[in-house]
Amino acid sequence: LFIYGASGAAVEIYDLAERVNVLSHRYSKIYLIDDFEEETQYYGTDRVHFSSCERIAKEAFEFIIAVGEPSARDLLLKRIEEKGYQLATLIDPSAMISPTAKIAAGCIVNAQSIVSSNVIMEKNCFLGFHVVVGHDAHLKRNTVVCPMATVGGGSTVGENTFIGLNSSMKERVNLGNNVFVGMGSMVFRSVEDGDTVLGNPARVTKGNAEHKVFRK
């Protein structure tokens, strides 16, 4: 397994992969990928460059993206797909997943999260710790839902959208693409593409033309 990233999110996903591997014994080795640092030992494993994968048969490994910035997840996903590499799906053993939920390749579901009945999670979604996704919700590609957040039943979350720590969405609320929901926000109304919302109740503060959550 190659974990694309070597930041704080990546080491959390490394721990998740180890927990999954205890039960599944799927991976003989778990690597971290970081093209901006030298290849060396990091967090008890090998940190390598993306190009290292070219020396291994494509069917012999899988990728998972461990980056919390939705636009970066989208970029890395396209890079992986262009190479024809396979995506893993990592679901913590402690997560509660409905048998009717549909979780696509590349998705991450962290510890103690709940994915309820008839939920659809498209490719490359990321759920943090203790996230609740209500029945019939639809999370589109590259959605990131941070720890302790709740997505109400029947809601739709657009592509490349970020839901901050401890935020909540009312049922049947729709978030557009490239939306940023700030930490601790309570979303009672639908949000248009590219908007940033904050507060309780959540109000639009500004657009997100750069489609960036984490800015230097």
Where are each of the predicted segments found?
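Phosphate-bearing ligand-interacting subdomains
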Residues: E37-M96
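NAD(P)-binding Rossmann-fold cofactor-contacting core
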Residues: V20-Q41
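Glycine-rich adenosine-cofactor-binding loop
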Residues: L1-A17
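Structural signal for interior beta-strand "rungs" in well-ordered beta-sheet cores
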Residues: T89-T205
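Short hydrophobic segments within beta-strands
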Residues: F2-Y4, I33, A66
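A glycine/serine/threonine-rich, flexible loop-to-helix segment
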Residues: E59, F188, G194, N208-K216
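Short alpha-helical
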Residues: G8-V11, S71-A72, M186
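Short amphipathic alpha-helical segments
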Residues: Y14-A17, G44, L75-R79, M121, ...
